[in-house]
């Protein structure tokens, strides 16, 4: 996701800022910040000071910028840099010990948990959910999107469109769900990500869980078929959809702008996308109890939710940290950072900056327990 952000170099961290890697979602603009607004959620007894860096998911970029500003309100001597190099690159950098934390759109793999023993002085690295963002099915259709109207679709219809099985906007499968709309006989042009993308994986996992008969591809961060045209990054998808009538794509909700969005069928209703609706599906989901390692909070999204008002297509992004660090200052920072980021104040800052969904209250006690596991002495 992209924002107009102020980038200021910090010499002590230039090695991290200049990491050359490919973003999982969006562009690779490194973010550093050294002054801020106030925060009441960060540790007040001992302000954090020093230079700290993270790298990873570009989906988090705008939120991280807001979090840095908020964190530094009560920790003005903390100099923080974040390189949105992509989830995979960020995790690998963290596993070399070069960063205090990684941002990732997917949970650690078993081999990455094992590898973390080389950088964590005790135990293994763990993931904490910090960022929830609804994924919009966006479209550009004359007379509909430009009139501010939604189009209703169930999972099977969306899957068939993105698999090239439905090719006209007035196809009966769409028209029967939108009897109040006059849909044109316009060809559908699918726009998908051309780059490796966590957003893609979360998007197609919805099909895999809800309508598997209509989506038979292996789950991957790469787009699996030759339907439509590819575009790099969230901005590329949005730009391409805007350019032509009849287009449809998928993108982080914060980037939708004035494009039309699909209201997705949940139970017997069609729910429009919103931050709050995205949070509801996470509140109706469970933790994945199959992951290895202590203190990990990995969400198994309940795409088949029937929760009132829930929007089922969402991305969950994590911060990955150690339970113990060689440098005590790193541990103190990681603990204070996660405490702020997952607080009500931190989540509100992310929502204001990036349109994210807040962490549901049902997760708060587990998140606090995991953060408390970080040893600072």
Where are each of the predicted segments found?
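Sec-exported extracytoplasmic/periplasmic mature domains
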Residues: 65-77, 95-99, 139-143, 159-171, ...
């Amino acid at each position: 996701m992209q924002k107009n952000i102020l980038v200021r170099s910090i010499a002590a961290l230039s090695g991290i800022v200049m990491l050359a890697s490919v973003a999982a979602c969006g562009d690779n603009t490194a973010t550093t910040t050294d002054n801020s607004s106030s925060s009441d959620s960060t540790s007040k007894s001992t302000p954090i000071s020093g230079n700290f860096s993270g790298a990873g998911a570009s989906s988090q970029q705008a939120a991280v910028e807001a979090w840095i500003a908020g964190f530094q309100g009560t920790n003005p001597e903390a100099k923080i840099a974040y390189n949105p190099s992509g989830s995979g690159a960020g995790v690998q950098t963290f596993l070399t010990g070069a960063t205090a934390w990684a941002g990732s759109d997917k949970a650690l793999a078993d081999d990455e948990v094992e590898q973390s023993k080389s950088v964590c002085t005790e135990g293994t690295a763990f993931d904490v959910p910090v960022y929830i963002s609804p994924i919009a099915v966006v479209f550009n259709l004359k007379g509909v999107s430009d009139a501010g109207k939604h189009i209703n679709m169930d999972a099977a219809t969306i899957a068939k469109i993105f698999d090239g099985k439905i090719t006209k906007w007035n196809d009966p499968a769409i028209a029967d769900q939108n009897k109040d709309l006059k849909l044109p006989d316009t060809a559908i042009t699918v726009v998908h990500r051309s780059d490796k993308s966590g957003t893609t994986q979360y998007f197609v996992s919805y099909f895999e869980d809800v309508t598997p008969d209509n989506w038979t591809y292996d789950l991957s961060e790469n787009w699996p078929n030759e339907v439509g045209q590819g575009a790099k990054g969230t901005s590329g998808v949005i730009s391409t959809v805007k350019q032509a009538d009849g287009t449809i794509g998928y993108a982080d909700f914060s980037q939708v702008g004035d494009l039309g969005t699909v209201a997705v069928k949940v139970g017997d209703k069609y729910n429009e996308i919103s931050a709050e609706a995205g949070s509801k599906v996470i509140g109706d989901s469970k933790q994945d109890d199959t992951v290895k390692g202590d203190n990990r909070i990995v969400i198994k999204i309940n795409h088949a939710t029937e929760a009132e008002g829930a929007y089922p297509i969402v991305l969950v992004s994590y911060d990955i940290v150690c339970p113990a660090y060689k440098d005590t200052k790193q541990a103190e920072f990681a603990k204070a950072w996660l405490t702020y980021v997952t607080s009500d104040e931190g989540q509100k800052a992310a929502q204001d900056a990036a349109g994210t969904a807040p962490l549901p209250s049902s997760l708060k006690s587990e998140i606090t327990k995991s953060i408390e596991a970080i040893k600072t002495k």
